């Protein structure tokens, strides 16, 4: 298995994957240059954000950290794969790991991020009727839940 608990030495790589994915996927939606290219920086994110939640992060590492997943109880909080390694099954393996090892059963996705929603649906998560505003924005997050037949009883 190429998935392991994140270590302090992974922080800059995790932040790098997060920053570039955010710029690619969310800048077209929010169009906030100040955030995407100003506030959103690898070093400050690794230092101020990711080091505080490292205990909840797992990385896909086959010699290079290619993606990561953050889990909080049974919620998938973040799932990112380096853009260079997308479409290689890494995201799916991280999702399977979260479901199997942590009984992950739900997540929230930006409503306009249809690519992500389609990915989650391919991996047995379905849209629910729940939605909420992304904090500090006018954009909605939609809740996806693991199909009931797919849930693992623990």
Placement of each model-derived feature along the sequence:
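A short beta-loop-alpha structural element at the N-terminal edge
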Residues: 2-16
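Conserved GNAT-fold acetyl-CoA-binding loop/helix
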Residues: 19-46
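Conserved catalytic-core motifs of GNAT/GCN5-like acyltransferases
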Residues: 108-110, 126-143
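Conserved acetyl-CoA-binding loop-helix of GNAT-fold acetyltransferases
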Residues: 87-100, 118, 122
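Conserved beta-hairpin
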Residues: 54-67
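Conserved GNAT acetyl-CoA-binding A-motif
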Residues: 100-112
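A short, internal acetyl-CoA/4′-phosphopantetheine-binding micro-motif in the GNAT/acyltransferase core
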Residues: 76-86, 109-110
């Amino acid at each position: 298995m190429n998935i392991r608990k994140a270590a302090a030495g992974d922080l800059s790589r995790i932040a790098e994957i997060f920053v570039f994915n955010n710029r690619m996927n969310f800048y077209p939606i929010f169009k906030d240059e100040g955030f995407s290219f100003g506030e959103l920086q690898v070093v400050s994110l690794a230092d101020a954000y990711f080091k505080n939640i490292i205990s909840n992060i797992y990385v896909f590492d086959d010699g290079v950290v290619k993606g990561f997943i953050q889990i909080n109880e049974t919620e998938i909080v973040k799932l990112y794969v380096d853009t260079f390694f997308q479409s290689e099954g890494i995201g799916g393996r991280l999702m399977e790991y979260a479901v199997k090892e942590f009984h992950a059963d739900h997540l929230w996705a930006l409503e306009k991020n249809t690519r992500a929603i389609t990915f989650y649906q391919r991996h047995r998560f379905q849209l629910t009727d729940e939605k909420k505003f992304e904090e500090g924005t006018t954009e909605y997050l939609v809740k996806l839940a693991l199909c009931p037949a797919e849930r693992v009883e623990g």
